Amino acid sequence: MTKHELIVWRYIREKQLGVKFKRQVPINRYIVDFFSLEIGLVIEIDGGHHYDPKITKKDKVRTNDLLNWGLTVIRYNNDEVLTNIEGVINSIGEKVDELKERYEIE
């Protein structure tokens, strides 16, 4: 787990946002950074190498596959985590609330 993933993990572990997240979860042929099975939410934290055009293309394929499997995917980059962790966590919390409402989870 990267330093940036650990920062996010501190805020989402132990149902702090109302759902359980697991880290480094295998989904088919991918390993995602964080996943909540309850609401089908994948969270990815992208490092600097994700700006490489080849990696960006692979990320798009990966995201499309996850979406096609019925999951919701949100991505943040390392800079966002370091400079705006409050905004990142608020954004995740809003998505969690939206999906809990969609799936009628209290």
Which residue stretches match the model-derived regions?
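Nucleic-acid endo/exonuclease domains
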Residues: M1-E106
